[in-house]
């Protein structure tokens, strides 16, 4: 059933980590789960131009800690950290609890074109600009291949190019072994709102196999020999505003 189940959920505890990490009383689980969804929706809506790849939530007592993985950390942080302050105030107003501490850590995505969520967002933006869907998919695959992925599969469904009858088309390059649990599969689903209706976009990215004991090995630089000496330091912002 590897082609039916969500590849990320299928690998939780094996090669993937939970997006929300906290424990709570069973009576409070529904409330906190809804809070997590509200937080993610708010961040994605207000930072739609920042290239948000993933949002992880941790809870410790009365503190909520967010880890935002983004392609453009400067947009999230803002000048002098003003963006972080504005985001924190907005989240406190959303949760209707100004006493709750919210820490926001921003991490830059290392390989933007090897991230399924960012590739899906790129395709959605192109489709909303009325670019032909086959051209969008081809460009996304080329970008992923240049980033050194071992395989990629993209599926687009809906009224493609404004056709009267909706249909589903997909294409794959390289290997995408959905049944192999040690395979590092990144998956994302997004939608594009066009004048003809909503198009659904699914992206699977195979970045290689994770062998036990080799998780911390450096990622391969396949397809990037020229940039070996031009690697810039990954940006990271750790929120220390609530530390005494």
Swiss-Prot record:
Ranges of residues in domain KH type-2: 39-110
Entry's Gene Ontology BP terms: translation
GO molecular function: mRNA binding; rRNA binding; structural constituent of ribosome
PROSITE patterns: KH_TYPE_2, RIBOSOMAL_S3
Keyword RNA-binding: yes
CC per GO annotation: cytosolic small ribosomal subunit
Pfam families per record: KH_2, Ribosomal_S3_C
InterPro entries associated with the record: KH_dom, KH_dom-like_a/b, KH_dom_type_2, KH_sf_prok-type, Ribosomal_S3_C_sf, Ribosomal_uS3_bac-typ, Ribosomal_uS3_C, Ribosomal_uS3_CS
Annotated HAMAP family: Ribosomal_uS3_B
Protein name from the UniProt record: Small ribosomal subunit protein uS3
Organism of provenance: Synechococcus sp. (strain ATCC 27144 / PCC 6301 / SAUG 1402/1) (Anacystis nidulans)
């Amino acid at each position: 059933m590897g082609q039916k189940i969500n590849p990320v959920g299928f690998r939780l505890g094996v090669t993937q980590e939970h997006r929300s990490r906290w424990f709570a009383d069973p009576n409070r689980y529904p409330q906190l789960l809804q809070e997590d969804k509200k937080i993610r929706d708010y961040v994605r809506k207000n930072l739609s131009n920042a290239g948000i790849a993933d949002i992880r939530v941790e809870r410790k007592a009365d503190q909520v800690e967010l880890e935002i993985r983004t392609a453009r950390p400067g947009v999230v942080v803002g000048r002098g950290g003003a963006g972080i302050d504005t985001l924190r105030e907005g989240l406190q107003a959303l949760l209707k609890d100004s006493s709750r501490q919210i820490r926001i850590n921003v991490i830059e995505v290392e390989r933007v074109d090897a991230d399924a969520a960012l590739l899906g967002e790129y395709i959605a933006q192109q489709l909303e600009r009325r670019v032909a869907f086959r051209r969008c998919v081809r460009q996304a695959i080329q970008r992923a291949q240049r980033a050194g992925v071992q395989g990629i599969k993209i599926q687009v469904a809906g009224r493609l190019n404004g056709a009267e009858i909706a249909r589903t088309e997909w294409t794959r390059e390289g290997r995408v072994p959905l049944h192999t649990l040690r395979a590092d599969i990144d998956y994302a689903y997004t939608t594009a709102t066009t004048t003809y209706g909503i198009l659904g976009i699914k992206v699977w990215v195979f970045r290689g196999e994770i062998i036990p004991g080799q998780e911390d090995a450096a990622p391969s630089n396949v397809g990037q020999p020229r940039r070996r000496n031009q690697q810039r330091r990954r940006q990271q912002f750790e929120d220390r505003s609530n530390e005494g």
